Curated annotation (Swiss-Prot):
Name of the molecule in the record: tRNA N6-adenosine threonylcarbamoyltransferase
Coiled coil ranges: none
Cited Pfam families: TsaD
Organism listed in the record: Streptococcus pneumoniae serotype 4 (strain ATCC BAA-334 / TIGR4)
Annotated Fe cation binding sites: H114, H118, D301
Any Gene Ontology CC annotation: cytoplasm
Cofactor note: Binds 1 Fe(2+) ion per subunit.
Family the entry assigns: Belongs to the KAE1 / TsaD family.
Annotated function: Required for the formation of a threonylcarbamoyl group on adenosine at position 37 (t(6)A37) in tRNAs that read codons beginning with adenine. Is involved in the transfer of the threonylcarbamoyl moiety of threonylcarbamoyl-AMP (TC-AMP) to the N6 group of A37, together with TsaE and TsaB. TsaD likely plays a direct catalytic role in this reaction.
Cofactor(s), by name: Fe(2+)
Compartment(s): Cytoplasm
GO biological process terms held by the UniProt record: tRNA threonylcarbamoyladenosine modification
């Protein structure tokens, strides 16, 4: 049987990434050109800057991904691409490159939901058994997803306001930490104590919804009031207290979801899945099901995860036409 190679593109935000997946499970290359340094001084991602960077480097990323995989353009069997959710300008760069490559070589084009990519990155650890439950935590999303089979995703719970990664970056900015602040807050939290009483919104409510805006506001108010009074607060203790509140919320809702949807596997994915505190809480408290977390290199945005997610779409022959467009607000269906 002839080997099949998927060339995958990911440009939904501030990472330009191209990857090659061989025979559905062997990631041969996963090139990532990060723009973090360009966005740090703004304290967040500037969409126009992100789009321009994607244009500048995407051709080189394609060449590097193919070279690293040890294949040529003629060896590629299909092209996969993120078409949402994300920044519309950034998405369009990846879409344009993917469509051009697929059209020029007469290859099928596979559309992939960015969040499906995060979830299916777990496939790199071991073959997934369905049904399963997933906790997806990133800068733009916090949601619980029930997956009845590969490619069939249903949201069973999500945030009403801020995503957890967004809350991390906002409190990090208040403390003067470098963007993105998640890793630094995690490190500082492990050096401090949970001594500040921050709210755990909706933690006792009988639903699977999250809320982080109240926690974020309480943190900002405490920090602001201390500054006004000239009081000194421990950054380590602030981080420890904030992270403890976040983890309490995430764990409470995840446990409720596992009670409601009996599964054997819990996937935890997205950029925040790299958080050491979250991994420690999962290991200590989720013991009745197997917890699968993608390796750190596949937690952030990358094309490797898009390649893994494209396999089920390819098997279903879910191919896109040349009119495939960016869908910045693309979302999974909600469980009825």
């Amino acid at each position: 049987m002839k080997d099949r190679y998927i060339l995958a593109f990911e440009t939904s935000c501030d990472e330009t990434s191209v990857a090659v997946l061989k025979n559905d499970d062997e990631l041969l290359s996963n090139v990532i050109a990060s723009q973090i340094e360009s966005h740090k001084r703004f304290g967040g991602v500037v969409p126009e800057v992100a789009s321009r960077h994607h244009v500048e480097v995407i051709t080189a990323c394609i060449e590097e991904a193919l070279a690293e995989a040890g294949i040529t353009e003629e060896d590629v069997t299909a092209v996969a691409v993120t078409y949402g959710p994300g920044l519309v300008g950034a998405l369009l760069v990846g879409l344009s490159a993917a469509k051009a490559f697929a059209w020029a070589h007469g290859l099928p084009l596979i559309p992939v939901n960015h969040m499906a990519g995060h979830l299916m990155a777990a496939q790199s650890v071991e073959p997934l058994e369905f049904p399963l439950l997933a906790l997806l935590v990133s800068g733009g999303h916090t949601e619980l997803v029930y997956v009845s089979e590969a490619g069939d995703y249903k949201i069973v719970g999500e945030t009403r306001d801020d995503a957890v990664g967004e809350a991390y970056d906002k409190v990090g900015r208040v403390m003067g930490l470098t963007y993105p602040a998640g890793r630094e807050i995690d490190e500082l939290a492990h050096q401090g104590q949970d001594i500040y009483d921050f709210p755990r919104a909706m933690i006792k409510e009988d639903n699977l919804e999250f809320s982080f805006s109240g926690l974020k506001s309480a943190f900002i108010n405490l920090h602001h009031n201390a500054e006004q009074k000239g009081e000194s607060l421990s950054t380590e203790d602030l981080c420890a207290s904030f992270q403890a509140a976040v983890m309490d919320i995430l764990m409470a809702k995840t446990k409720k979801a596992l009670e409601k949807y009996p599964v054997k596997i819990l996937v935890v994915a997205g950029g925040v899945a790299a958080n050491k505190g979250l991994r420690e809480r999962l290991a200590a408290e989720i013991t009745d099901v197997k917890v699968i977390i993608p390796p750190l290199r596949l937690c952030g945005d990358n094309a490797g995860m898009i390649a893994y997610a494209s396999v089920s779409e390819w098997n279903k022959e879910n191919f896109a036409g040349w009119d495939l467009n960016a869908k910045p607000s693309l979302a999974f269906d909600t469980m009825e």
